[in-house]
Regions:
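Residues lining hydrophobic/aromatic ligand-binding pockets adjacent to catalytic sites
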Residues: 1-145
Length: 145
């Protein structure tokens, strides 16, 4: 599994407290710091929990401006382009890590599952509507994959 961030703002630990283009292999052998800009929300729609103008007004995703704009962004590039991008990132990581097993792209969204203001639901919707099964990672990982 290759973790790939979709976040506008990654947590600092994801880049070992260095720049956003820094990636590294942690003590568990997991590569951290990989990103795909095809999935990163545009910064002009950065609303976050504290900045959300719709907080407590909008309780469903279809009426949230951020979610609508993010869904439009995903639809502005082809599914094939996204699959190719994820494949390229995984192939590079696979070579760097030196494993021969098939790599699986795991899109990382840093909000908790319960947070309705999260790209995770829009990413899942986009892939599922385009015939690609996309669901939440099941834990514990070792027992499920």
């Amino acid at each position: 599994m290759i973790p790939i961030s979709t976040a506008m703002w990654d947590p600092k630990w994801f880049h070992d407290f260095k720049s956003n283009d820094f990636n590294f292999i942690d003590k568990n052998g997991v590569i951290n710091g990989l990103r795909s800009e095809l999935f990163v929300p545009d910064k002009q729609y950065d609303c976050g929990t504290d900045l959300c103008k719709e907080k407590d007004k909008v309780t469903d995703i279809p009426n949230c401006k951020f979610m609508n704009e993010y869904y439009s962004k995903l639809n502005s590039t082809t599914l094939e382009g996204k699959i190719n991008e994820l494949g390229r990132i995984c192939k590079n990581a696979q070579g760097r890590l030196g494993f021969k097993e098939e790599s699986i792209a795991v899109l990382i969204v840093f909000e908790v599952v319960e947070n309705m203001c999260s790209e995770r639901q829009i990413i899942q919707k986009y892939f599922n509507e385009n015939g690609v099964d996309c669901k939440e990672l099941a834990y514990p990982i070792k027992e499920n994959y």
